[in-house]
From Swiss-Prot:
Descriptive protein name: Pyruvate dehydrogenase E1 component subunit alpha-2, mitochondrial
Species this chain originates from: Arabidopsis thaliana
Main location: mitochondrion
PANTHER family in the cross-refs: PYRUVATE DEHYDROGENASE E1 COMPONENT SUBUNIT ALPHA-2, MITOCHONDRIAL, PYRUVATE DEHYDROGENASE E1 COMPONENT, ALPHA SUBUNIT BACTERIAL AND ORGANELLAR
Keyword set includes Chloroplast: no
């Protein structure tokens, strides 16, 4: 009965994209950097604020970069799937395929001075912030050269030099941390904002409302981004939320609902949100998106939703295919050029995997690095408590 009810709701995922396929484009000149105006077919829905313009200014160069970056992210996640099944990745692993438009669209609207903090589904956000594939794969496999020195794993990617403050494993716990980052930005007069990303499952957490309250009270430059992929683990939004209009959850805080599988719509929304947050304080962005994999690698992803639903979203809403259509329809690239690019990306990912496999395992001393105060004299023993493994200085 639950499945039949869920199946009847599958059209919810398809409606925005069916409307979104036709887009009107005006090309001013034919050079790569020349401006192109694309009008999104899916309108933004706003709460307590004006909606941004649906006319998005871009360029053929940017659209091509969107395709390349999303294709790289997709291939990385596919490779991670294989590595996990080969038992080269241990523990938790949450994949982002299907949601790539969020990572690239957001980056197109902000700078590295702006901070991002997210949940455990963080691989592509790390790459979007300028992270290297080899650093990602090294971290996934627990190697010394990983972005968190092999100690974070899938859920705890990190890149401080690009203002990426992680991957966090506790549902919703990153939201107050993100608002704290926004407080620091305001205190230091940085003229920057923080994007705190969370899923629809975390949208029901009490700490979200507490952080939102203080952010609004102090007019912090915090942008709370709900990545609504419609399932919190295996629980559909209609089962967990009385009001699944997450962009309205702030009540007194403005919000915007966005087609999260359209990279250009995401870019426009994030640009609008940044301008708003710097002047007026927090805003909520609800990104309507979809994940192709299950919640994690232990979840087949097909027990609480139908395979027809998944394939239906792929056919009409896939973020990469939508950009591919733009590139082909408007003669920005040929089919062969795009296939060649995908072939190069596949090799790039394969090379990164091979290089990461050669990276050494962290030293035993890394178990306590960044954990305890230096010179505290903590000792580490083997499982039998007999053999001394490492003594901290």
């Amino acid at each position: 009965m639950a499945l039949s009810r869920l199946s009847s709701r599958s059209n919810t995922f398809l409606k925005p994209a069916i409307t979104a396929l036709p887009s009107s484009i005006r090309r001013h000149v034919s050079t790569d950097s020349s401006p192109i105006t694309i009008e999104t077919a899916v309108p933004f829905t706003s709460h307590l604020c004006e909606s941004p313009s649906r006319s998005v200014e871009t360029s053929s160069e940017e659209i091509l970069a969107f395709f390349r970056d999303m294709a790289r992210m997709r291939r990385m996640e596919i490779a991670a799937d294989s590595l996990y099944k080969a038992k080269l990745i241990r523990g938790f692993c949450h994949l982002y395929d299907g949601q790539e438009a969020l990572a690239v669209g957001m980056e197109a609207a902000i700078t590295k001075k702006d901070a991002i903090i997210t949940s455990y589904r963080d691989h592509c956000t790390f790459i979007g912030r300028g992270g290297k594939l080899v650093d990602a794969f090294s971290e996934l496999m627990g190697r010394k050269t990983g972005c968190s020195h092999g100690k974070g794993g899938s859920m705890h990617f990190y890149k401080k030099d690009a203002s990426f403050y992680g991957g966090h494993g506790i549902v919703g716990a990153q939201i107050p941390l993100g608002c704290g980052l926004a407080f620091a930005q305001k205190y230091n007069k940085d003229e920057a904002v923080t994007f705190a990303l969370y899923g629809d499952g975390a949208a029901n957490q009490g700490q979200l409302f507490e952080a939102l309250n203080i952010s609004a009270l102090w007019d912090l430059p915090a942008i709370l981004v709900c990545e609504n992929n419609h399932y919190g683990m295996g629980t559909a939004t209609w089962r967990s939320a009385k009001s699944p209009a997450y962009f309205k959850r702030g009540d007194y805080v403005p919000g915007l609902k966005v087609d999260g599988m359209d990279a250009l719509a995401v870019k426009q929304a994030c640009k609008f949100a940044k301008e708003h947050a710097l002047k007026n304080g927090p805003i909520i962005l609800e990104m309507d998106t979809y994940r192709y994999h299950g919640h994690s690698m232990s979840d087949p992803g097909s027990t609480y939703r139908t395979r027809d639903e998944i394939s239906g979203v792929r056919q009409v809403r896939d973020p990469i295919e939508r950009v591919r259509k733009l590139l082909l329809t408007h003669d920005i690239a040929t089919e062969k050029e795009l296939k060649d690019m995908e072939k190069e990306i596949r090799k790039e990912v394969d090379d990164a995997v091979a290089q990461a496999k050669e990276s050494p395992i962290p030293d035993a001393s890394e178990l306590f690095t960044n954990m305890y105060v230096k010179d505290c004299g903590v000792e580490s023993f083997g499982a039998d408590r007999k053999e001394l493994k490492v003594t901290l200085p």
